[in-house]
């Protein structure tokens, strides 16, 4: 099983300044050293803001992925190549021209599998 696009973008953020909020409401801002596929994050040079508003400086921190509420990544990652490929995939699904497009639409509308309807309900049973 391959990793999804959001995790790929998270890996792209390694080495950049990110903000991470945990489920307990603490906010960590610092350099993302490493991110794992399960969203475990190792960060350095951290400014942590606790729920009561206190601010502290930490040298290193390791946050378990299941305890992360959300991450704020740098805006420069909007141009990441994996996001470009997602845009291109959606681009080709517009209306085509000619008979081929009509046939494609008919095939797509038919569906798959057994769901062929009830048939003739007035048919004599055997």
From Swiss-Prot:
GO terms for molecular function: enzyme binding; histone pre-mRNA DCP binding; RNA binding; telomerase RNA binding; U7 snRNA binding. Residues 5-77 form the Sm domain. It is found in: Cytoplasm, Cytosol; Nucleus. Residues 110-119 are annotated as: 5 X 2 AA tandem repeats of [RM]-G. Methylated on arginine residues by PRMT5 and PRMT7; probable asymmetric dimethylation which is required for assembly and biogenesis of snRNPs. GO terms for biological process: 7-methylguanosine cap hypermethylation; mRNA splicing, via spliceosome; protein methylation; RNA splicing; spliceosomal snRNP assembly; U2-type prespliceosome assembly. Signal peptide: none annotated. Transmembrane segments: none annotated. InterPro entries: LSm4/Sm_D1/D3, LSM_dom_sf, Sm, Sm_dom_euk/arc, SmD3. PROSITE patterns: SM. One of its GO terms (cellular component) is U7 snRNP. Pfam families: LSM. Keywords: Acetylation, Cytoplasm, Methylation, mRNA processing, mRNA splicing, Nucleus, Repeat, Ribonucleoprotein, RNA-binding, Spliceosome. Sequence repeats lie at residues 110-111, 112-113, 114-115, 116-117, 118-119. The modification N-acetylserine is found at residue 2. Its main location: cytoplasm. In the autoimmune disease systemic lupus erythematosus, antinuclear antibodies are developed with Sm specificity. Core component of the spliceosomal U1, U2, U4 and U5 small nuclear ribonucleoproteins (snRNPs), the building blocks of the spliceosome. Most spliceosomal snRNPs contain a common set of Sm proteins, SNRPB, SNRPD1, SNRPD2, SNRPD3, SNRPE, SNRPF and SNRPG that assemble in a heptameric protein ring on the Sm site of the small nuclear RNA to form the core snRNP. Component of the U1 snRNP. The U1 snRNP is composed of the U1 snRNA and the 7 core Sm proteins SNRPB, SNRPD1, SNRPD2, SNRPD3, SNRPE, SNRPF and SNRPG, and at least three U1 snRNP-specific proteins SNRNP70/U1-70K, SNRPA/U1-A and SNRPC/U1-C. Belongs to the snRNP core protein family. Plays a role in pre-mRNA splicing as a core component of the spliceosomal U1, U2, U4 and U5 small nuclear ribonucleoproteins (snRNPs), the building blocks of the spliceosome. Component of both the pre-catalytic spliceosome B complex and activated spliceosome C complexes. As a component of the minor spliceosome, involved in the splicing of U12-type introns in pre-mRNAs. As part of the U7 snRNP it is involved in histone pre-mRNA 3'-end processing. This is Small nuclear ribonucleoprotein Sm D3. It comes from Homo sapiens.
């Amino acid at each position: 099983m391959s990793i999804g696009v959001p995790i790929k973008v998270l890996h792209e953020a390694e080495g950049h300044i990110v903000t991470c909020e945990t489920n307990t409401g603490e906010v960590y801002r610092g350099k993302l050293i490493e991110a794992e596929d399960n969203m475990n994050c190792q960060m350095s040079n951290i400014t942590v803001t606790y729920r009561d508003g206190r601010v502290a400086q930490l040298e290193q921190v390791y946050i378990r992925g299941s305890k992360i509420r959300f991450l704020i990544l740098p805006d420069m990652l909007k141009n990441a190549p994996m996001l470009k490929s997602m845009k291109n995939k959606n681009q080709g699904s517009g209306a085509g021209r000619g008979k081929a497009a009509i046939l494609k639409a008919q095939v797509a509308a038919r569906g798959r599998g057994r769901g062929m309807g009830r048939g003739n309900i007035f048919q004599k049973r055997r």
